[in-house]
């Protein structure tokens, strides 16, 4: 007999971070556990991170606090492989349903962001400035002038559940930047997912491989096949958000 597909369902449960940078709550909604138990949130449950380790992933889990009422837990234990579809539980504990992941900074608080698209697949998080005083986006590649394929590894910044990185490509150079997923052939003027032409700064939804990596190539060859003789300027990539499944 096949698995009941309802045990992977999740509705609502949009995560939000308080101004203190350590208190997390979720909006009204519900989710199922593998044993078919349904737990519901009325929007009042929250959890506060205490004694946090800097620069560490913390994963938010929902569990049944009694009578189907939802409670929340933050843990450094990563989610297990999906048990059905994209639904995951805490590794070693099927009573905890995975909701979202945050990463602490050097001060032991979460970098703020907006969980803008809650769902089972394709959840989107847009990262905010790191403090009320403002900050620059996270730079993941700076001053690129090399014309060889570069692998961008985001495993230290994005959770294991991440499927796409939302990247701004700042290309004031005279060359063209091509991007690709690491699991397929290297990017080139004839094989790419996205392109940033000279003088452009597009925002790209870059597909990640299973290791949370993607590849880029800065090339003298344009998308029309022409060749630029001289490189001036360089390319910078910044991380502005990501998508994940749950």
Give names to the regions the model predicted:
Residues 1-25, 78-146, 246:
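Glycine-rich, low-complexity segments
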Residues 2-80, 116, 153, 175:
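Glycine-rich, compositionally biased intrinsically disordered regions
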Residues 30-33, 52-64, 112-193, 236-245:
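Beta-rich globular "head" domains
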Residues 47-50, 138-141, 203-205, 226-227:
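Beta-strand-rich interaction surfaces with strong enrichment in secreted/lumenal proteins
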Residues 48, 150-156, 199-209:
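Exposed aromatic-hydrophobic patches
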Residues 93-111, 165, 206-229:
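Noncatalytic modules at the cell exterior or secretory-pathway interfaces
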Residues 183-213:
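Glycine-rich strand-loop-strand elements at beta-sheet edges
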Residues 227-238:
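Extracellular carbohydrate recognition
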């Amino acid at each position: 007999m096949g698995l009941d597909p309802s045990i992977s369902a999740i509705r609502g449960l949009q995560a939000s971070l308080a101004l203190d940078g350590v208190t997390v709550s979720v909006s009204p909604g519900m989710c199922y556990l593998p044993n078919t138990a349904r737990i519901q949130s009325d929007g009042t449950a929250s959890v506060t991170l205490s004694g946090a380790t800097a620069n560490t992933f913390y994963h938010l889990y929902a569990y049944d606090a009694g009578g189907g009422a939802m409670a929340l837990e933050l843990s450094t234990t990563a989610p297990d492989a999906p048990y059905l579809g994209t639904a995951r539980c805490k590794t070693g504990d099927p009573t905890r349903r995975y909701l979202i992941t945050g990463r602490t900074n050097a001060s032991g608080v979460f970098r703020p962001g907006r969980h803008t698209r809650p769902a089972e697949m394709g959840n989107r998080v847009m990262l905010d400035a790191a403090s009320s005083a403002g900050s620059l986006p996270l730079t993941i590649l700076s001053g690129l002038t090399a014309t060889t394929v570069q692998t961008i590894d985001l495993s230290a910044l994005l959770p294991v559940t991440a499927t796409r990185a939302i990247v701004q490509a700042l290309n004031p150079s005279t060359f063209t930047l091509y991007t690709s997923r690491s699991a397929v052939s290297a990017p080139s003027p004839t094989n790419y997912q996205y392109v940033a032409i000279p003088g452009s700064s597009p925002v790209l939804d870059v597909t990640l491989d299973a290791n949370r990596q993607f590849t880029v190539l800065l090339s003298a060859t344009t998308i029309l096949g022409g060749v630029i003789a001289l490189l001036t300027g360089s390319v910078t990539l910044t991380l502005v958000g990501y998508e994940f499944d749950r």
